[in-house]
């Protein structure tokens, strides 16, 4: 297996122009495909997950042109639901941001489409979404294991009263929200359980509004969506920088700054993961907010005990930053780490122990006490981009770290290690 050894980093300083947000890129691509008119998306993320969405749109007959660097995309909207000519199979890799929204959107009208993906995708639950779509009339068949992809979709979603469990993934609700306006009837979506990752729902609502559709949000408990609507192209749309990707550089500055400035997001960003900067500030770093940037300057870091349900992806970065904080850090209410690219609670606990941390792994929490000195270790990444990026922070000690399968960052940030090297000074 390929590996990358990072030598100790003495200091980080500089500016990072963030790649586009994965969450925003894939939502914007789907809405642009469903909309009337031509949409030009700029600062689109070029990564595995986005390529899977683009490949699916090609399979569905959507025409678009990409710039040479794949960050500008011109899409000719379909002016309504997407249809396949005859039976079709779409392979979506391990891209939850493609699988979940497409599973819903392709239930409009009459299709015969199979959605499948990598082995890990077949372990990521989708039952709550399928249950909700079936309540709205959709005809969906599990082809292998009940409640997991691959799925066969045969249309039929017309709207009506739909319940969805919000406790596992907010992407199920996102998928329903984006699909419901195009259904013939009105849809009332009721949320069962506690809604996780609520800020991601705000991204969805924000984008839908950009494409001309507003819905009634009743305190995130119930959503009322008028049927028979259509999305309208906004003309051009700039994709925000990826706030989850920003977390690694901001944390690096908190540990070994200097000052690092990330551009492409700022105080008015729609992504909940910008709140990660508040967590670093609480730990002792200095944060400065602009309209189009966030900067972080080193501080003496202290441990925290926090509910991280609102920023689950960025919270992983706090788990490795905790290695540099004084005291024991506890991250709570993060059960949904277990259903991501890998079981992130298990993976994080296992790898933190390798570098010498004392770790308690609970059902939905992790408690981390750093060692006096970090051990040199080979870090397994579990084909999870965030594991690779989080553990790069270990090099901010006086100990090198080896990252196995470093190219797994291609899911969201193909040139992550080059960007980190650009702001790093060797010890």
Swiss-Prot record:
MF GO annotations: 3-phosphoshikimate 1-carboxyvinyltransferase activity
Chain sites annotated for binding 3-phosphoshikimate: 22-23, 27, 169-171, 197, 313, 336, 340
Superkingdom: Bacteria
Pathway assigned to this chain's UniProt record: Metabolic intermediate biosynthesis; chorismate biosynthesis; chorismate from D-erythrose 4-phosphate and phosphoenolpyruvate: step 6/7
Gene3D superfamilies the record matches: Enolpyruvate transferase domain (3.65.10.10)
UniProt keywords, alphabetically: Amino-acid biosynthesis, Aromatic amino acid biosynthesis, Cytoplasm, Transferase
Catalytic activities: 3-phosphoshikimate + phosphoenolpyruvate = 5-O-(1-carboxyvinyl)-3-phosphoshikimate + phosphate
Top EC class, one word: transferase
Gene Ontology cellular-component annotations: cytoplasm
Protein function: Catalyzes the transfer of the enolpyruvyl moiety of phosphoenolpyruvate (PEP) to the 5-hydroxyl of shikimate-3-phosphate (S3P) to produce enolpyruvyl shikimate-3-phosphate and inorganic phosphate.
Subunit structure: Monomer.
Name of this chain's protein: 3-phosphoshikimate 1-carboxyvinyltransferase
UniProt lineage: Bacteria, Pseudomonadati, Pseudomonadota, Gammaproteobacteria, Enterobacterales
């Amino acid at each position: 297996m390929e590996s990358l050894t990072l030598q100790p980093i003495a200091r980080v300083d500089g500016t990072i122009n963030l790649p586009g947000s994965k969450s925003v890129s894939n939502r914007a691509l789907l809405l642009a495909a469903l909309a009337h008119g031509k949409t030009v998306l700029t600062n689109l993320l070029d990564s595995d997950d986005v390529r899977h969405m683009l490949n699916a749109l090609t399979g569905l007959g959507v025409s678009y042109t990409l710039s040479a660097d794949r960050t500008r995309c011109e899409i000719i909207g379909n002016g309504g639901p997407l249809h396949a000519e005859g039976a079709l199979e779409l392979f979506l890799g391990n891209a939850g941001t493609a699988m979940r929204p497409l599973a819903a959107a392709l239930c409009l009208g009459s299709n015969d489409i199979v959605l499948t993906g990598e082995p890990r995708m077949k372990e990521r639950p989708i039952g709550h979404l399928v249950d909700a779509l079936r309540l709205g009339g959709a005809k969906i068949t599990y082809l292998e294991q009940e409640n997991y992809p691959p799925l066969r979709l045969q249309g039929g979603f017309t709207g009506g009263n739909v319940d969805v469990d919000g406790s596992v993934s907010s992407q199920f609700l996102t998928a329903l929200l984006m699909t419901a306006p195009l259904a013939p009837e009105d849809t009332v979506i009721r949320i069962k359980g506690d809604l996780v990752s609520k800020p991601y729902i705000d991204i969805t609502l924000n984008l839908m509004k950009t494409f001309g559709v507003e819905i009634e949000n009743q305190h995130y408990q119930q959503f009322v969506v008028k049927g028979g609507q259509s999305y309208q192209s906004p003309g051009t749309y700039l994709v925000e920088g990826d706030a989850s990707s920003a977390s690694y550089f901001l944390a690096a500055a908190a540990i070994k700054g200097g000052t690092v400035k990330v551009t492409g997001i700022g105080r008015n960003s729609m992504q909940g993961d910008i709140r990660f900067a508040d967590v670093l500030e609480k730990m002792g770093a200095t944060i400065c907010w602009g309209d189009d940037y966030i900067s972080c300057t080193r501080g003496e870091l202290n441990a925290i005990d926090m509910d991280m349900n609102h920023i689950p992806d960025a919270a992983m970065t706090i788990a490795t930053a905790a290695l540099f904080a004084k005291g024991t850090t506890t991250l709570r209410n993060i059960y949904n780490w277990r259903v991501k690219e890998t079981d992130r609670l298990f993976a994080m606990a296992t790898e933190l122990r390798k570098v010498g941390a004392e770790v308690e792994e609970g059902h939905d929490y992790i408690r981390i006490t750093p060692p006096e000195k970090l051990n040199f270790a080979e870090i397994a990444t579990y084909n999870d981009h965030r594991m690779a990026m989080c553990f790069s922070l270990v090099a901010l000690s006086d100990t090198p770290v080896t990252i196995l399968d470093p190219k797994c960052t291609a899911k969201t940030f193909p040139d992550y290690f080059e960007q980190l090297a650009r702001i790093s000074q060797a010890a």
